[in-house]
């Protein structure tokens, strides 16, 4: 096996020369992916002034340095862009949109927003306050968006 099964991180081999290069490449990927978040979903890296370690989900119509990497995770490193293919079921927080995105194996999507409670024939103030607090906590954690 030359790479790991989930994120295609390079593996060391017996008698391999310059093992530190392979090891460092894997560490760059681990460092970015363990964060569990990306800056945003974008198609064009041109306007960015990225710092090493920052990551983005490449949109469906990439241009420039991201051409051919639609749906992948673009990671900025000292050596340029690195691209990781997400396994089905992976979830990342999109910091710009403040939502959690999930990869289903072919595309990224955000969880649908939860409607805030309204109406009803009997209003229970304590129940509404508790539900509002739960929804606020989920939203703050990036697990839900409330409309």
Task: For the regions a language model picked out, list residue spans one by one.
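Extracellular "spike/adhesin" assembly and maturation modules
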Residues: 1-62, 67, 74, 86-147
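Basic/aromatic-rich interaction segments and small domains that mediate binding to polyanionic partners
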Residues: 76-80, 84
